Every structure is written in C-alpha cells, then in structure tokens.
Amino acid sequence: MYKFDQKLNHSAAHLLAMALTKFYPNLSLAIGPTIDEGFYYDFNLNDPNTSITPLDLLKIEKEMKKITTQALTFDYEQVTYEKAKELFKHNKYKLDIIEQNKNNSLSIYHSGKWFDLCKGPHVQNTKEIKAIKLLNIAGSYWRGDANNDQLIRIYGVAFSDQDQLDAYLKDLQERKERDHRKIGKDLNLFTFNNLAGQGLPIWLPNGTIIKNQVQKFINEVEFQFNFDTVITPILGSIDLYKTSGHWDHYKDNIFSPVQIDNEILVLRPMTCPHHTLVYSNELRSYRSLPIRLSEHSILHRYESSGGLTGFERVREMILEDCHVFCRFDQIEHEVINAFKMIQEAQEGLGIKTFEIHLSLNDPNDKEKYYDDPQMWEQSQNVLRKMLKDHNIPYKEMVGEAAFYGPKIDFQVKTVLNRIITVSTIQLDFLLPNRFNLTYINESNEQSVPVMIHIGIIGTYERLLAILLEQTKGILPLWLSPIQVVIIPVNENLHTDYVKELNIKLRKHLIRSNVDLRNERLSKKIREAQIQKIPYQIVIGDEEIKNNKMVTYRCYGSEKTTTVSITDFINMLENKIRLKK
C-alpha cells in the first residue's frame, strides 16, 4: 500500500526545481504544486536550442536523490512585496504571482543557498524524502492559457520509503495495461484522426459491435419498463436552447451557431429540449401520464483540446437518454422505477454502484443555477425524502446539481479506484414551465407536469472506457466482437470444412471468423489470445474425419475440450443469453 503525503511531495517539487537550476541555470521557474498523486514543476528553459528528453530525467532524478542526503532544511521567511520583487526581478512568472498577491502576505522558503517563492508547508529536512521518481515530461501554458508562454512540465512522486514507491509504480503499470486507449487500439475498437477533428471518435467495426450489443440490451430494459423510443434532430434552433436555458447556463459547452437561410442552428448538446417537443405534440390528460421517452442520441459538446481524454472525454458522443413526464403524485413511483431500471442495466453490464450522491444546487451561485429558491427547495426535498423513506444511503453534494434541478448520481468505483458517475436521475420543475407543457387534470384544468431525466448508462463512449478498464479488454462472451475464431491446421486441406463450420455458427448468430492467413498455427493461436477472443477452434484431419465434433479452448487456458458441434453451439447460445 502507499499513501500520498502532500507536504512531502511539495518539498520534492522544490528538490526538482533545485536540480533543474543546477543543470539549466538560465531557466525561469514557474510553479511547482502538489497534485492528487505527486507533484510537478513548470518552467521555461529560455533557450529554443535546448530541450529536455526522458533520458534527462535520469540525471535530474539522480541529483534530487543526492540533495536528499544533504539534510537541507526548509526555512520559512515572510517577505515584503518590495523585497519579493527584488529577489525575483529576473523571473516574470514569479513577478506575476507576486503582483497578484501584493495585498496578501508573501513568503519564501530557503534550502541552503537556494530559495523559492512559496506558501509551504514543507517537511523539516530533505532526508525525510526517502524515495523519488520522475515520471514524465509534458507541455503546459502559463496560467493554463494557450495565449501565454508555453512551458515544460515534469511530473514526479515522492514517498517516505521505497516500498511505497515500488507499490505505486506497480499500480501505475497496472493502470497502463488497463488504459482503455491502449486496449481500444490493440483490439481495433475505435480510433481518432485529426483530419476528422479533435475529440471526434471513429467507431471501428469491432467497437461498433460492442456498442450495438449494449444498445440492444438497453433497448430491451427500456422496453420492459415501458419506455417509448423516439428519434429527434441532431441540430436545434438557437431559440430552442434559449427557451430551455441551456444557452444561458451551458453556452461555453455548445458549439458555435451556424446560420442557414433564416435560421440560426446549433449542434445539440442535450436531448431534453427536443423531448419536450415530443410531449407537446399532442394534448395530454392526467390519465395518459406518465409519458416515458427514450433515445440513443448523438450529441456535441465543446471540450478544450487539453481536456480530451480518449473515449472518456470527447466532443461527439452517443448518449442513452430517457425522460419521464408525470404528475407530482407520480414522482416517487417513477424515481423508484428508474432506480430499478438502472440496477437491472448495471447488473447486466457487470457494473456495481459504489455510492449514491444527492447533487444539490449552490444557492450562492446565481450564474450557474436557475434563480428560483422555492423551486430548488421543493425539488431537493422531494428527492431527499424519497431516499430517506426507502432507506437508500446517500451523500449530499452541494454545487453538483444540473442548472435546472437536483439529481441522484450513481457513482461507480473502478478497479483503479477512480470514482465515476455512470447513471443519473434528475428532477426538473423548470423545463416544463419554460416550454409551457401542460396536461388536463381531474378538474378539467391545465396543470404543469414534472420532468424526470434518466441516464441509465450515460454515454456509450465513457461506458466502453469503463468496461475496458474493468475487464482489461477480456469482455464477456455476449459483448466480444469476435466470439469464436476457427483456425485450420493446413490452409490447403482444411479450408472448405472451416468455411462450412463458420457458416453454421453464423446461422446461429454466433460471431465467428476464419483465420486463413498463411502463418504458423502457433502464431495464429497466440494472436487469437492477444485479441482476447473467447473461443478458439482448431480444425485438422481428425476433426474433419469426425465432422460432428469440434475441439476448442477458451481464452487464457491451455486446456482443450472436444464436444459435438450441436453442444458447442448450445453452450455459446446459453452463455450469450445469460450475458456471460
């Protein structure tokens, strides 16, 4: 096990800066904070002909370790604005920080003859830092603004003993092996191409199979819970999003509008405004509620290029999105119904909720949230009471609500201990009013329905990233793009029979492929293992002689099993049906 000590890592950042200053005396140090896992330091070499490579990290790290043995102390000194400016007069980044904090207390920390502008805190002396590792080099911008100077960033970690560092590095290697970007590339699931555009994913055939299988399953779940599927436009008029409030509260995430003829259109970032139009398409009665709608919609949301991360953060996404329009007295039933639907979907996908958050608004943030205190109090109390009445454990998270209402977030803990929101239930009293949605109540008068937003699995892109990380790419049979690979021992003698067997399997909707490449048998079997194909069948003279039998082996096993073709097909069909 390992534990990150913020004070220790902050001190290690100073050691990094000291080592850098020795090797690159003309550099300008920027900032060196701690982060969740370690530290980094940003700097400018001030020399276009000089660069830092991964090999340079070794000598820098060696110098840092040398400094730890010197038992240098970290000595605090409070300084005036004028003295701080004098000390750092040749460093524009430090001067920028000083100027920004001229009305606050300023301090520096000394270690021997070296010093840095810093608030602290630090360890007593450098000997407390027993284990250091510099991890990688990246680029950054001063103040995170692409209009400012481009800087170099070096990441590192520090621990109080070598065992913790070893454990962390082992964990880091495991993360790399589970990185959905690597697995997605190895299994040919998806790709990106700058010619298409940054953050715009291209689903390859194998990935599309997984997506379609998940969608088929989710469609079945939605059908069981009486949802009707709709299809709405990928574009929406700017007036649609002004009416919904997204333009005011979500504008930074909406792609720039385009004018076509006499309309101003935007790529839709949300489906909910479109679903209000489905509801308003006809007169509704209290007897016809609830109305339950679902859609697997393509959305576009702007993310900065620095925020794009594989399939986890993209600019185009496919969202599974459900909306319920109901009476006030139906809220509890519909929310519990949504709970059951989410639980069934997560169980089928092998996902387990770690904890539930009740995401509330921040009443002090008038810019982020719609300003209607009564609406917020009513909607939040409804969800809070429902969770308590049904003894559902939850945490309240202020400032995490949608701009239009509170939500229940289902948090999943991944094998790498990351907490990710997969499913949501959101209560909305705002949009029905903004779109003038009504129904005829029992008194033959108009009433406004309540809108409930439900995300069963979120986006398909993020879901696939989670599944790949959780399974290391070893997907269950029903999700595997290729379920069976058939390999002939001799391409010249066994090809006809192999093709016949492939046709037979495909008639039963089993996703089988034939490997007819002119390669060694051992190589084909090894590559089938690398591709994580659940079943491999090898066909030779003996199998053809007894043409009612097949010999197979499972992924990750050396054991072979011989069964009848009929039994093999029945076994696969049963596993697929049971989502195994």
UniProtKB/Swiss-Prot annotation:
Keyword Metal-binding: yes
Catalysis performed (reactions): tRNA(Thr) + L-threonine + ATP = L-threonyl-tRNA(Thr) + AMP + diphosphate + H(+)
Cofactor(s) required, per the database record: Zn(2+)
Entry's EC annotation: 6.1.1.3
Function recorded in the entry: Catalyzes the attachment of threonine to tRNA(Thr) in a two-step reaction: L-threonine is first activated by ATP to form Thr-AMP and then transferred to the acceptor end of tRNA(Thr). Also edits incorrectly charged L-seryl-tRNA(Thr).
Homology family: Belongs to the class-II aminoacyl-tRNA synthetase family.
Complexes and interactors: Homodimer.
Protein's name according to its UniProt entry: Threonine--tRNA ligase
Protein's organism: Ureaplasma parvum serovar 3 (strain ATCC 700970)
This protein's encoding gene: thrS
